[in-house]
Every structure is written in structure tokens, then in C-alpha cells.
Design a protein with these regions (language model features):
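Conserved alpha-helical substructure of the radical SAM core
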Residues: 12-14, 20-133, 298-304
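Conserved AdoMet/S-adenosylmethionine-binding subsite of the radical SAM
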Residues: 102-221, 225-230, 235
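Accessory C-terminal segments flanking Radical SAM cores
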Residues: 194-304
Length: 304
């Protein structure tokens, strides 16, 4: 996509596009977009304020049924301020886990907007906590122009009552939101063996990369990961949740804040990774009505 098209995209999102003056744009790469005079521009980026979740969905790509933990607010702010000196995302998402479980989410939203004044900010939530959301978070969502993506995971009367109560709260406050029907498009990020433990696929890396739609980088532990899903897998393996079958993920090296501009661009330009082989070549969709049951039924700390 040429520079003019990117400007048109930002304008359609209600954002100014002076960011792209004197910018070389490479839209055909899923992560790397281009560079301006000071920072590298990327298409999608996310953070996980918490990996804990109030749901226990089977085949969750974040392994949140088994992992838990919340990033301290000052630590998350430090990550954002550090990396904002090097990169500018067009789209920046707060995911997890369930981000509304973070006790100071409003501070994280405020700092993110201060770091990236023209970036589209999006909060991903399963919606069940929206009806009880703190006023401070609502006010932060509004003043920082944060859009909300509500993921609907199940479809039964009791769940729907709670879910749409949260959606109604967004309507009342005039917050921009959209709904993702995860109950219709939920797929397996991994397989389960005879012991009900997660095991990776054994795919052709190029084929898995080609069909992948989750090409979103993530900042975690003050490092930049090329792929959010890969970041989850690495952390879960390091925590002992995943077995030795996942060791190939550990070969990936995320970027640290002391990387050079050239190293950053090269990292975002690399395309298919050998580690892509742990993901499916073709997604298998399921109905996410079954909760995850781990053989040991225990949680592991995600953040050390």
C-alpha cells in the first residue's frame, strides 16, 4: 500500500496522518509498515496487562486456563514509554487474559495514549465484567478514544444475559465497540494429547504462516516479540505448562530496547519463522462450550 493509501486508512479511522510525512511505507509486510524520521512504524501491536482470565475456554491461545499473573502498573508503563521511543503502531491493543482484571488499567490506557497520540487504541474483553466496570476505567476509555472489541465466547441464556448487560453499558456511555462472534469462529491453537495436555501441530512453517491471521507483535517483559501467539507459547514453556514438544519455540529471540534501528527493521521484515511449524496449516473450528480441564488442575505464574 502506498503512502497515500495509508493516509486514507488513518483518515477513515478519524485520525490525523501527519505521522506519515517523509515516510517510506511497505504495507505488504504484516508487521513492518515503514519509517519516519525518528521511529519505526508497524501495523499491529499489543500488550497483555494480565494473563489471568475469568473464563476457562478450551484451546485458548493465551493458555489462560493454566496461566495467571498481572503486570505491575509501573512496570507496564516503563515498557510502553521505553518502546514508544522506537516504534509507532497504527493499531495498539490491550489483550490478555482479560484486561479488565487489571487493577489500574486506566493508568495503562492513559500512558498508551500519551505515548502514541494518533494510534488507534483497542481494548479486547469478553464483556462479562463490563457491567461492573470501574468509573475510572470508563472515563479513561472515553478520554483516550479507546475502541472496545467484545468477544462473545458462548451462547446460552445465562451467559447472554451477562454479556449483553455489558454491551448495554458501552452503549450508555457512547463508547465505540464491535462484537466478535468467537462462539462461531473459535479454533484450536494447539492439539491435546491422551493426557489432555497441549501439544503443538507439526506443520510446514510456510503453509502455517500463509494462513495465519494472528500476525500481531507484542511487548512483554520489555521485549518485542514478532508474534503474540509465539510469545504466549514461549512464556508457557518457560513456566513449565508446556512440555518438551514445544522446545522449538525457545529458539526465538525477541528484541530488547537497546536494539538498533536497523536490527528492528530487519526483525520485522523476516516473514515466515521456523517456529511457525507449531501452528496449524489449516484451522479447525470448534464450538467453545467445553471448559479446559488440565490433568493436574493447577495454575502457573506467567510473570515470574
Amino acid at each position: 500500500m502506498q503512502q497515500k493509501s495509508v493516509k486514507k486508512h488513518l483518515k477513515s479511522q478519524g485520525q490525523e496522518h501527519t505521522l506519515f510525512s517523509s515516510t517510506t511505507v511497505h504495507w505488504f509486510f504484516p508487521f513492518f509498515v515503514g519509517t519516519n524520521r525518528k521511529r519505526v512504524l508497524i501495523r499491529f501491536l499489543e500488550v497483555w496487562p494480565t494473563i489471568s482470565c475469568n473464563l476457562r475456554c478450551e484451546y485458548c491461545g493465551a493458555f489462560s486456563p493454566l496461566m495467571k499473573g498481572t503486570v505491575p502498573t509501573d512496570e507496564m508503563i516503563y515498557w510502553l514509554e521505553t518502546w514508544s521511543k522506537k516504534i509507532v503502531p497504527l493499531n495498539f491493543a490491550f489483550s490478555g487474559g482479560e484486561p479488565l482484571l487489571h487493577p489500574k488499567l486506566e493508568a495503562i490506557l492513559d500512558v498508551s495514549r500519551r505515548c502514541w497520540s494518533r494510534t488507534r487504541l483497542e481494548l479486547l474483553t469478553n464483556g462479562l465484567l463490563l457491567s461492573k466496570i470501574r468509573t475510572e476505567v470508563l472515563e479513561s476509555i472515553l478520554r483516550n478514544n479507546v475502541q472496545v472489541l467484545v468477544t462473545k465466547h458462548f451462547d446460552n441464556p445465562e451467559y447472554n444475559e451477562k454479556f449483553f448487560a455489558g454491551v448495554e453499558m458501552l452503549k450508555q456511555y457512547g463508547i465505540i465497540y464491535s462484537i466478535r462472534r468467537s462462539d462461531q469462529f473459535w479454533f484450536k491453537y494447539y492439539q491435546l494429547n491422551h493426557e489432555n495436555r497441549p501439544v503443538p501441530f507439526k506443520s510446514n512453517s510456510c503453509k502455517a504462516w500463509k494462513q495465519c491471521f494472528a500476525k500481531i507483535g507484542v511487548i512483554q517483559d520489555n521485549e518485542l516479540y514478532y508474534c503474540g501467539l509465539l510469545g504466549h507459547m514461549i512464556k508457557a514453556r518457560q513456566a513449565g505448562v508446556l512440555g518438551a514438544e514445544w522446545d522449538i519455540t525457545l529458539s526465538h529471540r525477541p528484541l530488547t530496547p537497546d536494539c538498533t534501528r536497523e536490527e528492528l527493521v530487519q526483525y520485522l521484515y523476516q516473514g515466515v519463522l521456523k517456529e511457525c511449524c507449531v501452528c496449524a496449516e489449516k484451522y479447525e473450528y470448534i464450538v467453545p462450550q467445553k471448559l479446559y480441564k488440565h490433568v493436574e488442575n493447577k495454575h502457573y505464574s506467567y510473570f515470574g
